[in-house]
């Protein structure tokens, strides 16, 4: 990566004077072009642009899902509850940058608190703490109530 290559999708658009709607990125794994939905998800998940031979790449949804699962299976270390994470790191959950281990979206403070209140484990995978975002937690059970 060069010293001035942007790693954020919005900085890429700004630096190269390209509208987000006109941006085209190729998946670093399968080399397919990202769809508009995948570009939006890439931006929402705050994923980093990868540079190969001075060319920017993103990641498509199927490849991201596969790579996240591979990372979890190969690099899972241990799991524990929120208070233990805080004791281990010496920092509050609010200060920690925690991503969803299923989709890679950064967790909001509310999602972190939900995990604590619902007694759901955080997972230490590849040297980073991960959890589950609200979209990956599972279906809403409220609609199943009589």
UniProtKB/Swiss-Prot annotation:
UniProt cross-references to Pfam families, sorted A to Z: E6 (PF00518)
Predominant subcellular localization, coarse grouping: host cell
Example GO BP: DNA-templated transcription
Keyword S-adenosyl-L-methionine among UniProt keywords: no
InterPro entries (UniProt xref): E6, E6_sf
Annotated keywords: Activator, DNA-binding, Early protein, Host cytoplasm, Host nucleus, Host-virus interaction, Inhibition of host innate immune response by virus, Metal-binding, Modulation of host cell apoptosis by virus, Transcription, Transcription regulation, Viral immunoevasion, Zinc, Zinc-finger
Zinc finger (unnamed): 27-63, 100-136
GO cellular component assignments: host cell cytoplasm; host cell nucleus
Cross-referenced Gene3D superfamilies: E6 early regulatory protein
GO molecular function, one term: DNA binding
Cellular localisation: Host cytoplasm; Host nucleus
Similarity comment: Belongs to the papillomaviridae E6 protein family.
Additional record remark: Belongs to the low risk human alphapapillomavirus family. The cancer-causing human papillomavirus E6 protein has a unique carboxy terminal PDZ domain containing substrate but low risk E6s do not possess this domain.
Function: Plays a major role in the induction and maintenance of cellular transformation. E6 associates with host UBE3A/E6-AP ubiquitin-protein ligase and modulates its activity. Sequesters tumor suppressor TP53 in the host cytoplasm and modulates its activity by interacting with host EP300 that results in the reduction of TP53 acetylation and activation. In turn, apoptosis induced by DNA damage is inhibited. E6 also protects host keratinocytes from apoptosis by mediating the degradation of host BAK1. May also inhibit host immune response.
Name this polypeptide is given: Protein E6
Source organism of this protein record: Human papillomavirus type 61
């Amino acid at each position: 990566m060069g010293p001035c290559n942007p790693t954020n999708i919005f900085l890429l658009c700004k630096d190269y004077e390209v509208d987000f709607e006109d941006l085209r990125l190729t998946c670093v794994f399968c080399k397919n072009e990202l769809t508009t939905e995948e570009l939006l998800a890439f931006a929402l998940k705050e994923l980093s642009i990868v540079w190969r031979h001075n060319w920017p790449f993103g990641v498509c949804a199927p490849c991201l899902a596969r790579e996240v699962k591979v990372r979890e299976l190969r690099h899972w270390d241990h799991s524990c509850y929120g208070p233990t994470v805080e004791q281990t790191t010496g920092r509050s959950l609010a200060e920690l940058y925690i991503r969803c281990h299923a989709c890679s979206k950064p967790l909001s403070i509310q999602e972190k608190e939900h995990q604590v209140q619902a007694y759901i484990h955080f997972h230490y995978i590849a040297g980073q703490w991960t959890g589950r975002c609200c979209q990956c937690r599972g279906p809403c059970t409220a609609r199943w109530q009589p």
